[in-house]
Structures are given as structure tokens and as C-alpha cells.
Regions:
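Core catalytic lobe of class I
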Residues: 2-312
Length: 313
């Protein structure tokens, strides 16, 4: 565990996420926003990396153990935003297919074949034969929930520009999950910065909203004063749990880069102004960029120093 870079706003650690987390003090982060390597998708060529476990159960347990430690590091009123994608069991080429041709570009042939065979056996042992959507996101979410995390939202990240897939016997994958967890029943959350702009309809008056023939209720006094009620919010409407955000390319980045708008939205809602955001899988630093843009401090962890170099450019 070593500090790779540090200034008054950013601290980057080089090392295994769990090992670094164990060295961090209690309550060091106000918010965690992260996207771990997906199960079985790609070999980044770094010993000890997440995502290369032989079975979903092993992957889920590593996630559970990591976030159990990070729960200590998170402030009592903090939130965890976890973006995680799914995988298919099988031998065919496709988006997030396990044991598929994508491994050819990621590892040596012998290593790839050995891992394929071990992973196939492990999947069959868990009663997940080829062609199955493994359901990794929900397996992880339920494991964290069983471990004491409070699952508040299962947000759909819809990708309007998702990459096409060469599959003909199922629909293309065009979304991923972003799970919102809290450590405690009462936590810091601000909906206003992420509200969607709303043009006031003609039946809005003084912050009150008309709904049919019902009388309205004054938000200030609680008294009925006509045919209006207080459901209209001048800051906009609740954005809901389906977020349509295009993917973006990051020159020189590793494969899994989510668009800055995604972590930025999580940070605005889930991290108090001036607070500290933590990403245990910092990668090319997208979460760090979002933290910087929103005036928060940042702690990033990655097992590959090359990604820290990329983030610092």
C-alpha cells in the first residue's frame, strides 16, 4: 500500500482495494462512487485484479468483503453508488460473454484456455450452464444487503449509444445498474442538484400545482385555499431511477470507462458540498474528475499504476 499521488484535493493510492481500505481511517469518505471490473469480462494483466474469479460466488464474496471494510471507511451519513454490469455464461462471442472470444485479446492463449475451463466448471457447479445471464449485479446487491447495507435504489443506466452486439438469439444489452446504498437509515441526500428542469405548466401558481378539481394545500400553512396543491417544485422534477446517459470514449483509457455525467450525478446527490468522494477502482479517474468538477475532494485506489498516470494527465 503506497500513496501514489497527493495534493490538498486528491489522494491516489496504488495497491489492492481491500488492502488499502484497511489502512484508511474510519469515516474518511462521505460518499463512495465506483464501477468495479465486471465478472469474467476482461483480463487487465495485473495480478490480484477483481473480475477474474472462477465463479460468481467467489466474485460476490470478494465484493462483499471489500465493501464491508469500506462501510467502516464511509461516514455514518454516507452513501455508496455502485455501478455494476452483468455477464453471460457461455462460449459464444457477445457483450460481456464469459469464456468467449474477447479473452483472445486479453491474455495468452494457454492462460486463456486454462481459465476458460476452470470458469466453465465453476459455473456448472453453481448450476449456471452456458447461455445464462448470470445476474451478477443482483447477486452482489443482495450480498451487500445481507451484510447490513440499506439498498435504496436500483437505478437503470440506459445507454442510448450502446455498442451493437453480434447476437441473433437475444436482445442487445443497453443498460447497466447503479445501486444506491446507505450505511444508516438517515443519510445525506440532496435531490435538488439533479432535478430535471421543468417548464411551469399553466396550472402552476406560486409554487402550487393544480390537480383536477381537488383543493390545493398551502405548503407554508397546511390550509386548503382553492383548487391547487403543493406537489410542484420550482427546482424541477425528481429525475427518477432510469437515467439515459450516453457512453463516452476516453483516449488511452482502459476498457471500462463510464461517462463523467454518471458519477457527477451521484456525487451531487450523495456527497455533501466540500466532502470527500472515494473510488476503490479509480481506473482512468472519471470519478475523480467528477469530484473535482463538483468541488469535492477525492480518494482513488487502483491496483495498476498506469491508470493513475492516465488519470493525472
Amino acid at each position: 500500500v503506497s500513496v501514489y499521488y497527493s495534493d490538498d484535493q486528491v489522494t491516489l493510492y496504488h495497491g489492492d482495494a481491500l488492502a488499502v481500505a484497511r489502512e484508511l481511517p474510519d469515516g474518511a469518505a462521505d460518499c463512495i462512487v465506483t464501477s468495479p471490473p465486471y465478472f469474467g469480462l476482461r483480463d487487465y494483466g495485473v495480478e490480484g485484479q477483481y473480475g477474474l474469479e472462477y465463479s460468481p460466488a467467489e466474485y460476490v464474496e470478494r465484493m462483499r468483503a471489500l465493501f464491508a471494510e469500506l462501510r467502516r471507511v464511509l461516514a455514518d451519513d454516507g452513501t455508496l453508488w455502485l455501478n455494476i454490469g452483468d455477464s453471460y455464461a457461455g462460449s459464444g462471442y457477445g457483450n460481456h460473454d464469459i469464456n468467449g472470444d474477447k479473452w483472445k485479446a486479453d491474455a495468452g492463449l494457454d492462460r486463456r484456455r486454462d481459465r476458460q475451463q476452470k470458469m466453465k466448471k465453476a459455473l456448472l457447479a453453481e448450476n449456471i450452464p452456458p447461455k445464462n445471464l448470470v445476474g451478477v449485479p443482483w447477486r452482489v446487491a443482495f450480498a451487500l444487503q445481507d451484510d447490513g447495507w440499506i439498498l435504496r435504489n436500483a437505478i437503470i443506466w440506459s445507454k442510448p449509444n450502446a455498442m451493437p452486439e453480434s447476437v441473433t438469439d437475444r436482445l442487445s444489452s443497453r443498460y447497466e445498474f447503479v445501486f444506491l446504498f446507505s450505511k444508516s437509515r438517515r443519510y445525506w441526500f440532496d435531490l435538488d442538484p439533479i432535478r430535471e428542469p421543468l417548464v411551469a405548466p399553466p396550472n402552476v401558481k406560486g409554487g402550487l400545482f393544480k390537480r383536477g378539481n381537488d383543493s390545493y394545500v398551502s405548503q407554508a400553512t397546511g390550509t386548503r385555499q382553492g383548487n391547487w396543491d403543493g406537489t410542484y417544485n420550482e427546482h424541477g422534477r425528481n429525475p427518477g431511477d432510469v437515467w439515459s446517459i450516453p457512453t463516452q470514449k476516453f483516449p488511452g483509457a482502459h476498457f471500462a470507462v463510464f461517462p463523467p455525467e454518471l458519477p457527477q450525478r451521484c456525487i451531487l446527490a450523495g456527497c455533501k458540498p466540500g466532502g470527500t468522494v472515494l473510488d476503490p477502482f479509480s481506473g482512468s479517474g472519471t470519478t475523480g474528475l467528477a469530484a473535482q468538477r463538483t468541488g469535492r475532494k477525492y480518494i482513488g485506489i487502483d491496483i495498476n499504476p498506469a491508470y493513475h498516470d492516465l488519470a493525472l494527465k
